[in-house]
């Protein structure tokens, strides 16, 4: 390489540093060797360097977005064992992965006994949304209610609801696994009401909708919740066995292995209301 060539190369290096393109800088020498060997021309080399840099930036973006979404454990649809859950319509799940339900601000309900893959599917769909550049927030129902209760005590409830309403997709995991604290149903109602027809949700539960009155400790609040959550909804029911128990099935008693069907009742025909003396916009605990 001539002196002029070395000078130009150093100028390119400085430019890549100034533009904060570390991957392109890292690949520069190897790319130049490919040009010298006649493997690629200048245009192809430029395309290769830019693609390498873009790939790195996209990887970093996704990693940061997953952390912001609280998706610390990444699951994918590719790793989901559809063969183990024959009751599950794979085509329907893959259609959800196109994320049109997010654009339509719909609620996706994943219902089934424990261990049937509800959280895996919810996480995988959330990961797809992150990759597509959509904002996501993932939490269990217990975590959401605890955060809302804390915000209420600190006089920050409106701000917390506004924060949880910003995400294009809110995933609420494990509805029905833990008892809802007193007043928690009303707090969750306020969040659902704020997101209604504005933001999409994925909700997982091991309890049928008919049991939500028991889950939330108030059938009236449960009806108001279901009124909104079933208005624009997709309901996926999994009637299979537990992934976590399949390798130890012989150790589990038959009455534990048997699954309980979770059949959703028809959606409420009229809009539900919170308890007497409570406004629709600001239920009290």
Model regions and ranges:
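Conserved P-loop
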Residues: 88-166, 215
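Charged, compositionally biased N-terminal leader segments and the immediate start
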Residues: 1-25
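Clamp-loader machinery-focused feature within the broader ASCE/P-loop NTPase space
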Residues: 56, 61-95, 103
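Generic structural signal for secondary-structure transition and capping sites
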Residues: 21-24, 55, 101, 169, ...
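Interdomain "pre-motor" coupling segment immediately N-terminal to P-loop NTPase/helicase cores
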Residues: 17, 21-73
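Short hinge/gating elements
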Residues: 11-14, 30-34, 79, 107-111, ...
């Amino acid at each position: 390489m001539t002196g002029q060539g070395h000078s130009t190369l150093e100028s390119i290096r400085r430019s890549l540093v100034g533009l904060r393109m570390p991957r392109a800088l890292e690949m520069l020498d190897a790319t130049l060797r490919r040009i010298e060997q006649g493997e690629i021309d200048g245009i192809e080399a430029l395309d290769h360097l830019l693609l390498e840099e873009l790939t790195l930036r996209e990887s970093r973006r996704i990693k940061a977005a997953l952390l912001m979404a609280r998706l610390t454990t990444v699951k994918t649809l590719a790793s989901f064992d559809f063969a183990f859950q024959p009751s599950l319509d794979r085509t329907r799940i893959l259609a959800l992965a196109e994320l049109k339900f997010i654009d339509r601000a719909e609620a996706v309900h994943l219902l089934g006994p424990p261990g049937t893959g509800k959280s895996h599917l919810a996480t995988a769909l959330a990961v797809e949304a992150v990759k597509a550049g959509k904002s996501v927030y993932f939490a269990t129902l217990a975590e959401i209610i605890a955060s809302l209760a804390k915000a209420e005590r600190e006089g920050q409830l409106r701000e917390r609801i506004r924060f949880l309403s910003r995400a294009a997709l809110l995933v609420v995991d494990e509805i029905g696994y833990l008892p809802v604290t007193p007043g928690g149903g009303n707090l969750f109602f306020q969040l659902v009401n704020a997101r209604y027809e504005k933001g999409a949700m994925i909700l997982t539960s091991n309890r049928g909708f008919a049991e939500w009155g028991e889950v939330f400790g108030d059938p009236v609040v449960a009806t108001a919740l279901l009124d909104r959550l079933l208005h624009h909804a997709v309901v996926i029911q999994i009637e299979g066995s537990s992934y976590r128990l399949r390798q130890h099935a012989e150790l589990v008693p038959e009455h534990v292995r048997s699954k309980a069907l979770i059949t959703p009742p028809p959606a409420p025909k009229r809009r539900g209301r919170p308890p007497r003396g409570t406004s629709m916009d600001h239920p009290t605990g």
